Amino acid sequence: MNLLSFDHVLKNPQDYVSEIYTYGFQDVADGRHIFRNIQPRGYHDDFAKFVSKLFPDYKIELNFVRRSPLNQEEPNFIHSDEMMGDITCILYLNEMAPVEDGTTIYDEDKNPLFVIYSKFNRMIAFDSNVFHSRNIFENFGYEESARLIQVIFLKYKK
């Protein structure tokens, strides 16, 4: 398993988050699952540019922001993103989050290996076939204080 973590990813993260909130969020159906509070992003936003430079041998398959307020119903908890790509990148976008917020990484038997804590403007990247979950099952906050992350799935260029 490979895992990377970078702090201070975006040059102007407060402006970036403000811009996200100007566009709003939507629910996206994927088969029998509904992913709530999603904002699709393009291939050229600041996070996508950072990730593309960091991983030049990969292409962006999907780029979106997700807002997850307290008690929002989610389609999964412990899961892998194997069907989405080869590398999963998560950018934490809350200036103020509960100290326990972040991502837990699991082994193949879904036993916790380690916990990564969120920090505003921190990115983590890991192999998409790795089991992981948000640290706080029920999410947190409301409206602009709700959990806010950006996710990019990368696929190896063949």
Could you describe each region identified by the protein language model?
Residues 70-158:
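Catalytic core of non-heme Fe(II) oxygenases with the double-stranded beta-helix
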Residues 1-76:
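Non-heme Fe(II)/2-oxoglutarate
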